[in-house]
Amino acid sequence: MRKLTNFCFAGLILLGLSLAMCSEQPASKSATAVCDTLEASTPQQALAKLMAGNERYVAGQGIHPRSGMDRVAETAPHQAPFAGVVGCSDSRVPVELLFDQGIGDIFVIRTAGNNVNSESVMGSVDYAIEHLGVKVLLVLGHGSCGGVTGAISEGHEEHGNIGQLLGTIRNDVPQYVGKADSLDSAIRHHARVQVERILAYPHVAQKVQKGELLVKRAYYDVNTGKVTVD
């Protein structure tokens, strides 16, 4: 019995040492699958950090980093997210979860259809880029997007605010109206239009040209949980 107790105690010590190494030591290729210690000081590193998190999420190995009360206290005085994501309001697209990131890591802007065609949304994008200094900004479209579905549908009219929203999206994907079988292509194209809209602002384009920022289109597969970026 004493030997078993000593063995269990030694196991607990080793587990504690492993967790300490995970939180304190620089990441190696083998460690990144368990720990989220990747740097995000450059746009390329920031994107790699997001994609590594999504790989963990898809594999069912999410570690939910920086999500405890200590992180709440750390970020209370200020925020310094390394990434920004313009995502959809859809409840199936939980940005921090699908990238396996924590509190204060991602500045998230969610609108129906991940639409950037308004001053208020672009103001939020500017805030992320100019004031918070995010290194990467993704426009994240997703499969089965209701906003794009409604926008390209024929024979079904919405009125009021919803109708206005769908009309805005429809203007960005006119070639797909009436082509329900091309929904996925329409979703991806719509996200591309939003990226182009953001890059049309000179101050954003300048940061990209200087290598200080990446602005990319991304797509979230609601069936697999996987994010692809192009």
Model-predicted segments: where are they?
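Bacterial N-terminal signal peptides
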Residues: 10-20
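Catalytic core of membrane glycerolipid acyltransferases/transacylases, capturing the structured
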Residues: 92-109
